[in-house]
Amino acid sequence: MKTDIHPKYAPVVFRDLASGATFLTRSTVSSSKTIVWEDGNEYAVIDVEISSESHPFYTGKQRIMDSAGRVEKFNSRYAGFGTKK
């Protein structure tokens, strides 16, 4: 097996910017920013805009769009389109 071909796999903190939640996990991603975790150790921190803590699919706060009104509006706007005069 070849040595030194695998990326560095280390503990990393992911911080959700939308909810402020933080997750400690292992990853190959690195960052120059660091944070002190609850255990007192310092880890690299990666800021993410959305995670399972703030995504509507996982939080159950999904909005269902009313597409029926949009279809009717489209049909009324283009009802006579393509007919010869």
Curated annotation (Swiss-Prot):
GO terms for molecular function: structural constituent of ribosome. Keywords: Ribonucleoprotein, Ribosomal protein. It comes from the Bacteria. GO terms for biological process: translation. The keyword Ribosomal protein applies. GO terms for cellular component: ribonucleoprotein complex; ribosome. PROSITE patterns: RIBOSOMAL_L31 (PS01143). It holds the Pfam family Ribosomal_L31. NCBIfam families: L31, PRK01678.1. Part of the 50S ribosomal subunit. Belongs to the bacterial ribosomal protein bL31 family. Type B subfamily. This is Large ribosomal subunit protein bL31B. It comes from Clavibacter sepedonicus (Clavibacter michiganensis subsp. sepedonicus). The lineage of its organism: Bacteria, Bacillati, Actinomycetota, Actinomycetes, Micrococcales.
